[in-house]
Each structure stands twice: as C-alpha cells, then as structure tokens.
C-alpha cells in the first residue's frame, strides 16, 4: 500500500470529519551537499623543477648528495670503501 498513491482520506476516513482538511504536500527530501571536485593531474618528474644540494661543508666519513623535486627526495651517498647507497622517497 505504501507504493501506491492512495488519498489519505481513503486510508484514514475520520479525516473527512474535519472541515477544510487538505492533504499536506509531500516534503522535498534534503539534498546531500556535493564535495567539490578535486583537480588532479599526475606530475612527471621532468615537469618539475629539481633542487640539488651537497652535504654540509664540514668533512664527514660518508658525504651525501640530496636531490629534491615536488614529489621526491633522493639521498645519494658513497662510503669510504666505495659502496654507493641511493634512497628515494616518493611523496
């Protein structure tokens, strides 16, 4: 019965006893607010400016080089025995 449109006075005949009774209009359900669409674009490393910096001026046992972009940080180091270490962090 809920799916069919049946006049309220047919379902509840006592409402006919009230003078000037009118079926109230159906309320409009509130709309859910929409989240703003995000602009997304995959950035390539070649599109970005990169910044390269050297290790501090003080001598260290294992000097390193840091290369940064908008989405990555790369640290390169070479130990005294010649072992090369590269660590890249992608954000």
UniProtKB/Swiss-Prot annotation:
Residues 49-58 have a biased composition (Polar residues). It is found in: Host cytoplasm; Host nucleus. Residues 22-33 have a biased composition (Pro residues). Keywords: Early protein, Host cytoplasm, Host G2/M cell cycle arrest by virus, Host nucleus, Host-virus interaction, Modulation of host cell cycle by virus, Phosphoprotein. InterPro entries: Papilloma_E4 (IPR003861). GO terms for cellular component: host cell cytoplasm; host cell nucleus. Residues 1-62 are annotated as: Disordered. Its main location: host cell. The major E4 form is first synthesized as an E1^E4 fusion protein from spliced E1^E4 transcripts, such that the first few amino acids of the E4 protein are derived from the N terminus of E1. Assembles into oligomeric complexes. Interacts with host CDK1. Interacts with host SRPK1; this interaction may favor expression of late viral transcripts. Interacts with host cytokeratin components KRT8 and KRT18. Belongs to the papillomaviridae E4 protein family. This is Protein E4. It comes from Human papillomavirus 39.
